[in-house]
Amino acid sequence: MSTTGLSEFLPSFSGLYLDKEILMINKALNIGDGKRLGIIGGSKISTKLKVLENLTEKLDILFVGGGMANTFLLAKGYKIGKSLCEKTMLETAVNILETAKNKNCKLILPVDALIANDMEKGTSFSEVMIDEVPDDALILDIGPKTIEVINSFLSTVSTAVWCGPLGLFELNPFQTGTVSVAKEISKLTKEEKLVSVAGGGDTVAALSQSNYNKDFTYISTAGGAFLELLAGENLPGIEVLKK
Protein backbone atom coordinates (compact mmCIF):
# COMPACT_ATOMS: atom_id res chain seq x y z
CA MET A 1 0.00 0.00 0.00
CA SER A 2 2.86 2.40 0.81
CA THR A 3 4.03 2.40 -2.81
CA THR A 4 0.61 2.42 -4.47
CA GLY A 5 -1.90 4.16 -2.19
CA LEU A 6 -1.26 7.77 -3.17
CA SER A 7 -1.75 7.03 -6.86
CA GLU A 8 -5.37 6.09 -6.15
CA PHE A 9 -6.13 9.68 -5.14
CA LEU A 10 -3.70 11.89 -7.05
CA PRO A 11 -2.05 11.96 -10.48
CA SER A 12 1.26 10.13 -10.06
CA PHE A 13 4.48 9.93 -12.02
CA SER A 14 7.83 8.28 -11.60
CA GLY A 15 10.62 10.44 -10.22
CA LEU A 16 14.01 11.01 -11.78
CA TYR A 17 15.76 8.43 -9.62
CA LEU A 18 13.17 5.76 -10.44
CA ASP A 19 13.40 6.56 -14.14
CA LYS A 20 17.17 6.20 -14.04
CA GLU A 21 16.98 2.99 -12.01
CA ILE A 22 14.71 1.29 -14.54
CA LEU A 23 16.65 2.68 -17.50
CA MET A 24 20.04 1.49 -16.24
CA ILE A 25 18.90 -2.00 -15.26
CA ASN A 26 17.04 -2.38 -18.55
CA LYS A 27 20.09 -1.14 -20.43
CA ALA A 28 22.35 -3.56 -18.57
CA LEU A 29 20.16 -6.59 -19.20
CA ASN A 30 18.33 -5.93 -22.46
CA ILE A 31 19.61 -3.02 -24.55
CA GLY A 32 22.62 -2.70 -26.79
CA ASP A 33 25.17 -4.95 -28.40
CA GLY A 34 28.06 -6.81 -26.85
CA LYS A 35 28.35 -9.49 -24.22
CA ARG A 36 26.94 -9.12 -20.73
CA LEU A 37 28.45 -10.40 -17.51
CA GLY A 38 26.86 -10.74 -14.10
CA ILE A 39 28.51 -11.07 -10.70
CA ILE A 40 26.28 -12.52 -8.01
CA GLY A 41 27.52 -12.87 -4.45
CA GLY A 42 26.16 -12.92 -0.95
CA SER A 43 25.48 -15.80 1.36
CA LYS A 44 22.40 -17.67 0.12
CA ILE A 45 20.97 -18.99 -3.13
CA SER A 46 17.50 -18.89 -1.58
CA THR A 47 17.52 -15.08 -1.35
CA LYS A 48 18.57 -14.65 -4.99
CA LEU A 49 16.98 -17.69 -6.64
CA LYS A 50 14.78 -15.75 -9.06
CA VAL A 51 17.67 -13.41 -9.85
CA LEU A 52 19.90 -16.35 -10.75
CA GLU A 53 17.18 -17.93 -12.88
CA ASN A 54 16.49 -14.69 -14.76
CA LEU A 55 20.14 -13.80 -15.30
CA THR A 56 20.98 -17.16 -16.84
CA GLU A 57 18.54 -16.17 -19.60
CA LYS A 58 19.77 -12.59 -19.96
CA LEU A 59 23.56 -12.86 -19.63
CA ASP A 60 26.42 -14.44 -21.53
CA ILE A 61 28.59 -14.97 -18.45
CA LEU A 62 27.54 -15.33 -14.81
CA PHE A 63 30.05 -15.53 -11.97
CA VAL A 64 28.76 -16.83 -8.63
CA GLY A 65 30.79 -15.95 -5.54
CA GLY A 66 30.28 -15.33 -1.85
CA GLY A 67 28.75 -17.91 0.43
CA MET A 68 26.26 -19.05 -2.20
CA ALA A 69 29.13 -20.33 -4.35
CA ASN A 70 29.76 -22.98 -1.68
CA THR A 71 26.39 -24.57 -2.36
CA PHE A 72 27.18 -24.75 -6.08
CA LEU A 73 30.63 -26.17 -5.35
CA LEU A 74 29.20 -28.86 -3.06
CA ALA A 75 26.58 -29.68 -5.70
CA LYS A 76 29.44 -30.26 -8.15
CA GLY A 77 31.20 -32.61 -5.76
CA TYR A 78 33.80 -30.33 -4.20
CA LYS A 79 34.58 -30.45 -0.49
CA ILE A 80 33.90 -27.14 1.24
CA GLY A 81 34.95 -27.94 4.82
CA LYS A 82 32.87 -26.08 7.43
CA SER A 83 31.87 -23.34 5.00
CA LEU A 84 28.42 -21.79 4.86
CA CYS A 85 26.17 -23.90 2.65
CA GLU A 86 22.47 -24.39 1.97
CA LYS A 87 22.19 -28.16 1.72
CA THR A 88 18.46 -27.88 1.05
CA MET A 89 19.32 -25.96 -2.14
CA LEU A 90 21.73 -28.49 -3.67
CA GLU A 91 19.20 -29.78 -6.20
CA THR A 92 18.28 -26.20 -7.06
CA ALA A 93 21.95 -25.42 -7.65
CA VAL A 94 22.23 -28.38 -10.02
CA ASN A 95 19.14 -27.17 -11.89
CA ILE A 96 20.56 -23.65 -12.23
CA LEU A 97 23.83 -25.05 -13.57
CA GLU A 98 21.89 -27.09 -16.12
CA THR A 99 19.69 -24.14 -17.09
CA ALA A 100 22.74 -21.94 -17.61
CA LYS A 101 24.26 -24.59 -19.87
CA ASN A 102 21.07 -24.90 -21.90
CA LYS A 103 20.78 -21.11 -22.26
CA ASN A 104 24.43 -20.77 -23.35
CA CYS A 105 25.23 -18.75 -20.24
CA LYS A 106 28.72 -19.54 -19.01
CA LEU A 107 28.34 -19.98 -15.23
CA ILE A 108 31.68 -19.61 -13.46
CA LEU A 109 32.56 -20.64 -9.91
CA PRO A 110 35.68 -19.88 -7.84
CA VAL A 111 38.81 -21.84 -8.77
CA ASP A 112 40.65 -20.94 -5.56
CA ALA A 113 39.84 -19.41 -2.19
CA LEU A 114 41.06 -17.72 0.95
CA ILE A 115 40.33 -20.01 3.90
CA ALA A 116 40.56 -19.79 7.68
CA ASN A 117 39.53 -21.89 10.67
CA ASP A 118 37.34 -19.18 12.20
CA MET A 119 35.92 -15.73 11.54
CA GLU A 120 37.69 -13.89 14.34
CA LYS A 121 39.54 -10.62 13.79
CA GLY A 122 43.21 -11.25 13.05
CA THR A 123 42.68 -14.94 12.22
CA SER A 124 45.36 -16.63 10.16
CA PHE A 125 44.42 -17.55 6.59
CA SER A 126 45.80 -19.31 3.55
CA GLU A 127 45.20 -19.58 -0.20
CA VAL A 128 44.15 -22.95 -1.61
CA MET A 129 42.82 -24.30 -4.87
CA ILE A 130 39.13 -25.04 -4.68
CA ASP A 131 39.71 -28.82 -4.70
CA GLU A 132 42.09 -28.57 -1.72
CA VAL A 133 39.82 -27.13 0.99
CA PRO A 134 40.52 -28.93 4.32
CA ASP A 135 37.66 -30.43 6.30
CA ASP A 136 38.10 -27.96 9.17
CA ALA A 137 38.33 -24.82 7.02
CA LEU A 138 35.95 -22.01 6.11
CA ILE A 139 35.92 -20.49 2.63
CA LEU A 140 35.80 -16.74 3.30
CA ASP A 141 36.81 -15.12 0.00
CA ILE A 142 37.74 -15.84 -3.58
CA GLY A 143 41.44 -16.34 -4.26
CA PRO A 144 43.87 -14.51 -6.58
CA LYS A 145 43.42 -16.94 -9.48
CA THR A 146 39.66 -16.45 -9.36
CA ILE A 147 40.17 -12.68 -9.40
CA GLU A 148 42.28 -13.13 -12.54
CA VAL A 149 39.53 -15.22 -14.14
CA ILE A 150 36.85 -12.60 -13.44
CA ASN A 151 39.04 -9.75 -14.65
CA SER A 152 39.90 -11.60 -17.85
CA PHE A 153 36.20 -12.03 -18.64
CA LEU A 154 35.49 -8.39 -17.79
CA SER A 155 37.82 -7.36 -20.60
CA THR A 156 35.63 -9.25 -23.09
CA VAL A 157 32.20 -7.80 -22.23
CA SER A 158 30.46 -4.47 -22.71
CA THR A 159 28.22 -4.58 -19.63
CA ALA A 160 28.64 -5.82 -16.06
CA VAL A 161 25.91 -6.17 -13.43
CA TRP A 162 26.93 -6.81 -9.81
CA CYS A 163 24.83 -7.86 -6.83
CA GLY A 164 26.42 -9.24 -3.67
CA PRO A 165 29.94 -9.22 -2.15
CA LEU A 166 32.38 -11.98 -3.11
CA GLY A 167 33.64 -12.68 0.39
CA LEU A 168 33.34 -11.77 4.06
CA PHE A 169 34.19 -8.16 3.22
CA GLU A 170 33.66 -6.91 6.78
CA LEU A 171 36.74 -8.85 7.97
CA ASN A 172 40.25 -8.16 6.72
CA PRO A 173 41.66 -9.63 4.43
CA PHE A 174 38.49 -11.24 3.09
CA GLN A 175 37.43 -8.06 1.31
CA THR A 176 40.29 -8.59 -1.16
CA GLY A 177 38.23 -10.30 -3.86
CA THR A 178 35.46 -7.71 -3.79
CA VAL A 179 37.89 -4.78 -3.78
CA SER A 180 40.08 -6.23 -6.55
CA VAL A 181 37.15 -6.84 -8.89
CA ALA A 182 35.69 -3.42 -8.06
CA LYS A 183 39.04 -1.86 -8.97
CA GLU A 184 39.06 -3.57 -12.37
CA ILE A 185 35.46 -2.61 -13.12
CA SER A 186 36.24 0.96 -12.08
CA LYS A 187 39.23 1.05 -14.43
CA LEU A 188 37.32 -0.32 -17.42
CA THR A 189 34.39 2.01 -16.76
CA LYS A 190 36.63 5.09 -16.62
CA GLU A 191 38.20 3.97 -19.89
CA GLU A 192 34.65 3.81 -21.36
CA LYS A 193 35.09 0.14 -22.15
CA LEU A 194 32.36 -1.03 -19.79
CA VAL A 195 28.89 -0.07 -18.57
CA SER A 196 28.78 -1.08 -14.90
CA VAL A 197 25.68 -1.35 -12.73
CA ALA A 198 25.66 -2.50 -9.10
CA GLY A 199 23.10 -2.68 -6.31
CA GLY A 200 21.81 -4.40 -3.22
CA GLY A 201 22.48 -3.27 0.35
CA ASP A 202 25.59 -5.36 1.05
CA THR A 203 26.95 -4.66 -2.42
CA VAL A 204 26.69 -0.90 -1.98
CA ALA A 205 28.33 -1.15 1.46
CA ALA A 206 31.17 -3.28 0.13
CA LEU A 207 31.78 -1.02 -2.87
CA SER A 208 31.68 2.09 -0.69
CA GLN A 209 34.32 0.49 1.51
CA SER A 210 36.47 -0.14 -1.57
CA ASN A 211 36.16 3.54 -2.61
CA TYR A 212 35.74 2.48 -6.25
CA ASN A 213 31.96 2.89 -6.25
CA LYS A 214 32.16 6.47 -7.56
CA ASP A 215 33.54 5.23 -10.87
CA PHE A 216 30.70 2.80 -11.66
CA THR A 217 28.22 3.85 -14.32
CA TYR A 218 25.35 3.43 -11.89
CA ILE A 219 24.98 2.39 -8.24
CA SER A 220 21.41 1.49 -7.32
CA THR A 221 19.90 2.88 -4.13
CA ALA A 222 16.81 0.68 -4.39
CA GLY A 223 17.94 -2.09 -2.01
CA GLY A 224 15.64 -5.10 -2.26
CA ALA A 225 13.78 -3.59 -5.20
CA PHE A 226 17.02 -3.82 -7.20
CA LEU A 227 16.93 -7.60 -6.67
CA GLU A 228 13.32 -7.74 -7.80
CA LEU A 229 14.15 -5.83 -10.97
CA LEU A 230 17.09 -8.16 -11.65
CA ALA A 231 14.71 -11.07 -11.14
CA GLY A 232 12.43 -9.68 -13.84
CA GLU A 233 9.56 -9.18 -11.41
CA ASN A 234 6.86 -6.55 -11.68
CA LEU A 235 7.01 -4.03 -8.83
CA PRO A 236 3.63 -2.75 -7.55
CA GLY A 237 4.92 0.81 -7.31
CA ILE A 238 5.87 0.74 -10.99
CA GLU A 239 2.88 -1.20 -12.27
CA VAL A 240 0.42 1.28 -10.78
CA LEU A 241 2.06 4.10 -12.76
CA LYS A 242 1.26 2.29 -16.01
CA LYS A 243 -2.48 2.56 -15.45
Residue ranges and their predicted role:
Residues 1-243:
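Active-site loop-to-helix "anion-binding N-cap" substructures in soluble metabolic enzymes
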